[in-house]
Design a protein with these regions (language model features):
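Residue-level signal for the short linker/turn that defines the boundary of a DNA-recognition helix
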Residues: 8, 18-19, 45-48
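DNA major-groove recognition helix of helix-turn-helix/homeodomain DNA-binding modules
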Residues: 48-63
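Short, charged recognition helix plus adjacent turn
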Residues: 1, 55, 65-77
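Residue-level detection of the helix-turn-helix DNA-binding "recognition helix"
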Residues: 11, 15, 29, 40-42, ...
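A secondary-structure capping/hinge motif
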Residues: 34, 41-44
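A short, Lys/Arg-rich alpha-helix, primarily the initiator
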Residues: 1-16
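Short alpha-helical DNA-recognition segment
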Residues: 18-37, 52
Length: 77
């Protein structure tokens, strides 16, 4: 199985949510051009941005980093 990059995971998440770049970037507090740079692999998102994505859209950081196939964030009960 091919490992996906963070840029591919961000784009996959956005398209799964049926969001355009404008709405997704606004939801996480970044510019659309910055999101485009992330998705195209030009710039690597900071840890703060990745944490915001994980929290806002309830996905695991392990999934974003390609360390797990489990997309859903498991909360501590």
């Amino acid at each position: 199985m091919q490992e996906s990059s963070i840029s591919e995971k961000i784009k996959e998440l956005r398209t799964d949510l049926k969001m355009n770049q404008k709405n997704f970037s606004a939801a996480i507090g970044i510019r659309q051009s910055t999101l485009s740079s992330y998705e195209n692999g030009v710039v690597t998102p900071s840890n703060d941005v990745l944490l915001t994505i994980a929290q806002k859209f309830h996905v695991s950081l392990d999934w974003l980093f390609g360390l797990s196939e489990n997309k859903v964030q498991i909360s501590n009960l």
